[in-house]
Amino acid sequence: MDFKDKKDDGILEKLVHINRITKVVKGGRRFGFSALVVVGNQAGKIGVAHAKAKQVPDAIKKANETARRVLIHVPLREGRTIHHDVYGKDGAGKIILRSAPKGTGIIAGGPVRAVCEVLGIKDIVAKSMGTSNPHNMIRATMKALSKQNSPKHIATIRNKKISDVIEKRG
């Protein structure tokens, strides 16, 4: 059974990282596995989870179930990119996400690409710095995406019209 991309009831599941973990006990070592998973509906909803179990399939299943419970909404511009450039940091992981014109594609590496694909982002440029640890990169990406505001939300806060908030975009 392939666990990489599993699509069920409109939710796309992507396995980002599997790690073998060891617990040292009096009688020796106990081995287990941890799984990092991102899930999303490819229309602005995303969930991230990390789970541990004795077997790989059990860890993936637990992570998928947890990620489905913690879905959050991320506003997208035209359903294909983010509204404005954002920066996120977690631990040593730093990420810069920039909106891109139509046809650019997903220019991002590793874990950040998985987040963009399950979120439904089609055009984005991402630069990750500091670490290649998938856990920190995913958390930094989620922090960056949660900082994003739609022009409608910004207009309401500033008591202005949406057209006054939106600048000429390329």
Swiss-Prot record:
Entry's Pfam families? Ribosomal_S5, Ribosomal_S5_C
- Asked whether the UniProt record includes Methyltransferase among its keywords, one would answer no
Outline the extent of the S5 DRBM domain: 11-74
- Is Ribosomal protein there in the keyword field? yes
Domain of life, per the record?
A: Bacteria
Its GO biological process terms?
Answer: translation
What cellular-component terms does GO give this entry?
Answer: small ribosomal subunit
Question: Per its record, what are the GO molecular function terms?
Answer: rRNA binding; structural constituent of ribosome
**Which Gene3D superfamilies has this protein been placed in?**
3.30.160.20, 3.30.230.10
* Keyword annotations: Ribonucleoprotein, Ribosomal protein, RNA-binding, rRNA-binding
Q: How does it assemble?
A: Part of the 30S ribosomal subunit. Contacts proteins S4 and S8.
The family line of this record is:
Belongs to the universal ribosomal protein uS5 family.
This chain's function reads:
With S4 and S12 plays an important role in translational accuracy.
Q: Anything noted about its domains?
A: The N-terminal domain interacts with the head of the 30S subunit; the C-terminal domain interacts with the body and contacts protein S4. The interaction surface between S4 and S5 is involved in control of translational fidelity.
Protein name as annotated: Small ribosomal subunit protein uS5
Species this protein is from: Pelagibacter ubique (strain HTCC1062)
